[in-house]
Amino acid sequence: PDRRVLFTGDLVFNGGTPFMVMGSVTGSLAALEHLSSFDADVVVPGHGPVCDMTVIERLRRYDEFILDVATRAVNDGVSPLEAARDTDLGEFSELSDSERLVGNLHRALFELAGAEPGAPIDLVAAIGDMVAFNGGKPLTCLA
């Protein structure tokens, strides 16, 4: 604390798409809210280069983006894969591992349907849709 350095572990991805398939979108938002209360000059993320606190706000926007896309998917009656294919990543298009969007939508839709945050989801379906979104190519991870 005296050096104003925040070690975040796997909660923070800098430069890569977060992966919440086995976690929770709402839980991630709560954790990011807590992290934002720290007065740090330096953030050591679990993934990606050392950065500053602006990464926390960027990740919060990403999580809210996921919830917005998932809500539209529910309203439109489309699958996570269809929603992902129809989504412009906008400010998040430069993040690596963009196929994680599909897995994150699986998680968000599951939670919007009433599942407890962090409850197990159908990983085979989520990963299968991620591969399909990735053009049928195997997934890679640079984390």
Regions found by a protein language model. Give the residues of each.
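Metallo-beta-lactamase
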Residues: 1-72
